[in-house]
Amino acid sequence: MDNVRTALITGASSGIGASLAVAVAASGVTLHLSGRNSTRLEAVAQTCRGRGGIVTTTTLDVRDADAMAAWIGSAGHLDLVIANAGISGRSRDGGAECWNLARAIFETNLGGVLNTVLPAMAVMAEQLPGAGGVRGRIAVISSIAAFMAAPDSAAYCASKAAVDRWIVASAHEARQRGIVLTSVCPGFIRTAMTADYRFPMPGLMDADRAAHVILRGVTAGRGRVVFPWWMGLAARLAGLLPSRVMAAVASRHR
């Protein structure tokens, strides 16, 4: 990304976040990376430094609003912010999700995004506009799951739907302030999160390739990046199915 000199990425210690950090890293680019695993985060930072990047790392939980606001506020000028941190979870044996699991998913996937995007927008709104009047770009990692309602992943689907709709709905007003918002809805990505899945994952993609697709869409200023496109279409069609049909399909892959 030629116009990015400073970037901030959450959930950068593994998976898509790590691949995005490495993809953005280049000579003269400053990266502010956060994650919960300090050892893995430092390993990613070292890789980015090897590509010429200037890297700072912070170990924190995106659910901590005060810590997030302080971290983002201390970063200085921000060209690109990627709210990537997220978790998943599935109910066991077709039962309802426990309260603790559902709450953790919403607090991380939705609350964590709010704790990232809102402070970042405040910082960017004070920056001088660049090419095309853009003050900064913010991408949020949602999921193709946002378009459907998987019975055994209710909180995950709902949390990803919430952030997708929020970003898409906020994009016009944000653009008037010089801030470009992008909702990213990937399909299955080969990460630690999907390693334990025991069901078919059509279109499974490497995290490095996914990072390339994401950054290409963000650079183009797209409001929503959905890939693979055919998975996005399939998810939207699945979202039209009666709940009993979705439940029957899910039960076959437990």
What is the predicted role of each segment?
Residues S88-R103, E126-A131, D152:
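Conserved mid-core segment of classical short-chain dehydrogenase/reductases
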Residues S143:
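Residue(s) in the substrate-gating loop at a strand-loop-helix junction
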Residues V29-V44:
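Conserved glycine-rich Rossmann-like NAD(P)H-binding loop of the short-chain dehydrogenase/reductase
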Residues S13-S14:
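Conserved glycine-rich cofactor-binding loop
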Residues M148, A169-V180:
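Active-site-adjacent segment of SDR/Rossmann-fold oxidoreductases
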Residues V117, S159:
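Active-site helix of classical SDR
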Residues S183, F199-L233:
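C-terminal helical subdomain
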